[in-house]
């Protein structure tokens, strides 16, 4: 059975479209609202959804995502709650879902148990931003048994290091467009093309750019270099607005539709 991620990128290639990948922190402001946001995202044209697993020490997350992570953890959110939420969401949502979660929380849950439970609840893969290179093979070996994808995350670094990180990549490659934490930025370094060329030389798996894309205009600029754009902080900024939940969910949907139109 092919992984949903591969099928989605095949379909997008056929349509000559780039993937729209929004991020949302699980369980913020609460699990019920996250479910509604995910359903709204698919309706508004998202091609794949990235679900953040809140963690107490999120090294790669900017302030916006950190606020939602600590909010969800303060509500007592556990990984099991996220798994159950995905099971529920899967009754409506057909597009691929990947987790974004730190190695510490995966390891604490139990590596194989985490992969098995994730797959069974309807998750197709995970981005582990702090996965050590030396752990990669062991993690991938277990994931392969379950047709679960470990999505590599690369930053503009040496060609040699990029090659090691993306070796044997499956699904897509998460290309961080700037060195540093996530967040909303207005300008993105103009050497993106050279950087994506280096990644493309190392792997022919689809490349998606994330970290700092905050508007349809920026997404449009980025799309010529990659196969998809990932938008996190700009979405969570809306989720964190002090407005009624129904209105917030509608605003998230509108924002995703606007980005989707330019892709």
Curated annotation (Swiss-Prot):
Record EC number: 4.2.1.20
GO cellular component term, pick one: cytosol
Signal peptide: none
Sorted UniProt keywords: Amino-acid biosynthesis, Aromatic amino acid biosynthesis, Lyase, Tryptophan biosynthesis
Active site: 50, 61
Keyword Amino-acid biosynthesis: yes
Pathways involved: Amino-acid biosynthesis; L-tryptophan biosynthesis; L-tryptophan from chorismate: step 5/5
One Gene Ontology term of the molecular function aspect: tryptophan synthase activity
Keyword Lyase applies: yes
Function: The alpha subunit is responsible for the aldol cleavage of indoleglycerol phosphate to indole and glyceraldehyde 3-phosphate.
Xref: HAMAP family: Trp_synth_alpha
Protein's recorded name: Tryptophan synthase alpha chain
Gene designation: trpA
């Amino acid at each position: 059975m092919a992984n949903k991620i591969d099928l989605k990128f095949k379909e997008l290639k056929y349509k000559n479209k780039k993937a729209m990948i929004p991020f949302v922190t699980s369980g913020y402001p609460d699990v019920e609202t996250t479910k509604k946001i995910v359903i709204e995202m698919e309706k508004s044209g998202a091609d794949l959804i990235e679900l953040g697993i809140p963690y107490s020490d999120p090294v790669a997350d900017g302030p916006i995502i950190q606020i939602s992570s600590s909010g969800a953890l303060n509500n007592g959110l556990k990984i099991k709650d996220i798994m159950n939420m995905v099971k529920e969401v899967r009754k409506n949502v057909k597009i691929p879902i990947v987790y974004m979660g730190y190695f510490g929380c995966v390891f604490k849950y139990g590596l194989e148990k985490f992969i098995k439970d994730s797959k069974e609840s309807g998750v197709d893969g995970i981005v582990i931003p702090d996965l050590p290179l030396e752990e990669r093979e062991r993690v991938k070996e277990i994931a392969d048994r379950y047709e679960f994808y470990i999505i590599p995350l690369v930053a503009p670094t040496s060609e040699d290091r990029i090659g090691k990180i993306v070796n044997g990549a499956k699904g897509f490659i998460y290309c961080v467009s700037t060195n540093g934490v996530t967040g909303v930025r207005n300008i993105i370094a103009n050497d993106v093309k050279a950087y994506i060329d280096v990644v493309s030389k190392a792997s022919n798996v689809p490349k998606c750019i994330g970290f700092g894309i905050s508007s349809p205009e920026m997404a449009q600029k980025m799309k010529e270099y990659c196969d998809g754009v990932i938008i996190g902080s700009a979405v969570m900024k809306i989720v964190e607005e002090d407005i009624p939940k129904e209105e917030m969910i509608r605003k998230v949907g509108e924002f995703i539709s606007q980005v989707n139109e330019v892709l």
